[in-house]
Structure formats: structure tokens, C-alpha cells
Amino acid sequence: MAVTITRSGVLSLGADAVVLALEMTGSAAACPAGEELLRTGGEKLAAALNEAKFVAVGHAAELPESGLPAAHLLLTATPRYLTGKANELLILGRCYEAVFSLAEKLCCRSIALPFLSTFYYRFPQSEAVEIARRAAEKTPLEVFLCAETDALCNLARQPYQKPQIVSYFGYYRDYAVFTLSNGLFARVDLRPERVFADVVPYVEACYQRGNDPAQPPLPEAEIARLRRIYEESGL
């Protein structure tokens, strides 16, 4: 279904459902979209939030009697980006999957939400935007992704720039790792029968080149083959 990137507020688009991001503590996230919803919903929304059941990070729930003009208010608890070692990017993707799945179950045809965790949660902006766009493209809903700053809106409207490999990092067991231009890592499967690559926010020290003396170094030709797998992947 259609995906629209806009600078508009989530309530101005007439969507069947809107999304309120929550802190991990359960309180509304202090971001422009959250402030818009709290301001419009007033005391009724504040009271409903106080009575709401806990929503786990990466999950979603509907909040009835919200006092908002939208038919459905959906809640999702979003992750903070700390070190990248807690699967933050994966969990952020699950937040989108959860709210879209719930909206479909509620028979919604459209949904408006901010780019989750991008306002002050320290997420790598390009990756957070791409996670949102990819998730939105998979749902049959009409999705309005509402950027909370001009800079984020401009970034989100640009084609995704695939991070470039900077250097070979090392390998361990079945995977080789390359450092990327955005500070993340490309992980590529060494097994010839599996053509697989993905992007991960961190790697363990065991992948560092030369960490294991019993692990022979990869030939340069093999490193070049693995590099091509990443470059030709759809990441």
C-alpha cells in the first residue's frame, strides 16, 4: 500500500489509527508527536494512559477511550539505542511490525505514526528511517510516516544510501565481518552454499582479525568474494 513521508502531525492526516510511542517505563515519549497527542487528548488521554496495562518493548496495544479524533490509538514501547549490543535495530523493526499487525486486526485501512526512536533516542538516523520504510512497504495499510524535524524529513525522502565497506574486520566460524562507513558492520556467511549478508550494530571480539591463533587467515581472494556478496545484496 502507499507510504507517505510527511512533516505533518499524526492527527492532521485523518488516519484510522495513530501511534503513541512510549518510554520503556510506560510513560509517553517526550517527542513532538507524543506532545501533540497528549495535548489533544487532554485529561481523558492522561487518565487512560495511567490505567493502561504495561506494554513490553517491541510490542503494541490499543488504548481505548483515548479522547482523540482518530478511531484507534495504538501504543508501542520503543527501544533506546545504547551500545548496539542489545539488538536495538531488530527490536525497532518489531515495533513497526507490531503496530501494523494490530492495525490490520482492527480493520484499519490507514495509520499515521512518527519515525520511532529517532527524536532523541540516539539511533543511527539512516538505519532507523530505512527500518520504518521497509516495514511500511510490507503492510497493506496506507502508512503516513511523520517526520518530527525538517532534517529528518529531508533524510527520509532521499533514497537509502547503502553503507560502503571500509575494511575487513575478521572472521569467526561461519561468518566474516567488514566495518561499514556508517559505523555498523556487515556480516557475510562464509559457506559457499549460502549466499547471505546482513548488517549488525556490533560484533564480538572473537571476530577480530588475529584474535584466535588457531584460526588461519582468510585468503585475499576469499575476502574479495565475501565483499562482493555484500555489495550485490539487497541491503
Regions found by a protein language model. Name each.
Residues 10-15, 151-153, 195:
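A short acidic, often aromatic-flanked loop/helix-cap motif at beta-alpha or helix-coil junctions
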Residues 200-235:
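Mixed-charge, Lys/Arg-enriched low-complexity segments
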Residues 80-163:
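Phosphate/ribose-phosphate-bearing ligand recognition and processing surfaces
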Residues 1-106:
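Glycine-/small-residue-enriched capping loops at alpha/beta junctions
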Residues 71, 108-110, 140, 173, ...:
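Secondary-structure boundary/capping motif
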Residues 172-175, 179-213:
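Acidic, low-complexity, intrinsically disordered interaction modules
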Residues 18, 73, 112, 185-187:
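Short hydrophobic-acidic sequence motifs that mark active-site Asp/Glu residues
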